[in-house]
A protein has these predicted regions:
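Peripheral, non-transmembrane regulatory/ligand-interaction domains of membrane transport proteins
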Residues: 1-143
Length: 143
């Protein structure tokens, strides 16, 4: 039985952030084509509303909210999301560093989860990893 190649799992990790202070926002993943996409789902007791944008929508207080962000290579959008939702820069730094080891951190009213999603590519069938970060708050989730 032959083993399929494994991409992005054993890749030499480049140090793009050497010498920078903690909380500095630097994207360490591969440059992905396309722009950052944000899907916001507001859940109420009897309804929900889905909104797709390229910039974060300000937090609301009435409903629970799920904010799903894809293609995180635009640091400006991630920084704005952090400002709007009061996310600590250290969490944003961990989100942008796509070579994080799986971890979970607890702080005041926030649970931060970082993990690796493994999947097989469609064309090459190679095993690939992708970082998934979750920020759980009393009013919703950001992924």
């Amino acid at each position: 039985m032959a083993f399929k190649p494994i991409r992005n799992l054993l890749v030499a990790r480049k140090r793009k952030k050497s010498g920078l202070p903690p909380g500095t926002l630097v994207y360490t993943g591969s440059v992905d084509s396309g722009e950052t996409r944000i899907v916001t789902v507001d859940y109420g007791v009897e309804s929900h509303q889905v909104t797709e944008t390229i910039m974060p929508i300000a937090p609301n207080t009435g409903n629970s909210r799920w904010v799903s962000v894809t293609k995180i290579n635009d640091i400006g959008v991630i920084k704005k999301l952090g400002q709007d939702y009061n996310i600590d820069d250290l969490y944003l730094e961990d989100i942008l560093n796509t070579h994080q080891r799986p971890k979970i951190e607890f702080s005041d009213n926030v649970i931060f989860v970082c993990l690796q999603h493994l999947y097989r590519g469609r064309e090459t069938k190679a095993l690939t990893s992708e970082q998934v970060s979750l920020i759980l708050t009393p009013s919703g989730i950001i992924s």
